[in-house]
Amino acid sequence: MLRTQGLRYNYGGDGPNMAFPDLELKRGEELLLLGASGTGKTTLLHLIAGMRTPTEGTVELVGKPFSGLPVAERDLTRGQHMGIVFQTAHFVRSLTVSENLALCQSLAGQEADPHRIQALLEGLGLGHKLNARVDALSVGEQQRVSIARAVVHKPGVILADEPTSALDDQNTEVVLQLLRNQAADAGAALLIVTHDQRLKDHLTERIELSPIPTSA
């Protein structure tokens, strides 16, 4: 489903030249990418998601080249096959919760499915927030809506960027279980990128991310 090979990224100037390990993730699999600050976690996430273009190497999605696609085609492919939970939630603030989820389905080339949206929100304890404005939600509620938005179009890959870094132990377990359950329901691969060492107790498949700057 998701495969990377020989990824490197050069920030140019005095910025680091970063090399990353190869990854392969199939539907239904989970992988934890651990790394301290400065190891390039966010850079790697952006490369995988097609938000940056690698200096070298490739990203394949659903068995096809992804990283080398034109930007517009890359955006469309991402919308169809990926769901992303960002560290800070991003929504269209003028829309309701259900409208934000329907927009995600539309960007994936799907018709809005009110029944799926309602069922998904109810499963996350947010059925009563269906028509609420996202800026009226608490931080925790926004995070759950972010998870709903990441899976509403049934993507093949879910990427989560530091989903638990600001949470206490109890809420860390709650959010992690929500992610895993929703990924399983969608039949999606789950990739969590974080510095949160607590997640090692929950996910056995993991890679310690420590890319070595290269001069090449």
Identify the residue ranges that each predicted region occupies.
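Conserved ABC ATPase signature
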Residues: 133-137, 141
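ABC-type ATPase nucleotide-binding domains, specifically the catalytic core motifs of the NBD
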Residues: 12, 102-115, 123
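Helix-to-loop junction immediately C-terminal to a conserved catalytic motif
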Residues: 49
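ABC ATPase NBD coupling module
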Residues: 66-83
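Short coil-to-helix segment of the ABC ATPase nucleotide-binding domain corresponding to the Q-loop/switch region
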Residues: 95-102
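A short, proline-enriched helix->beta-strand linker immediately N-terminal to the Walker B motif
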Residues: 152-156
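Catalytic Walker B motif of ABC-type/P-loop ATPase nucleotide-binding domains
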Residues: 158-161
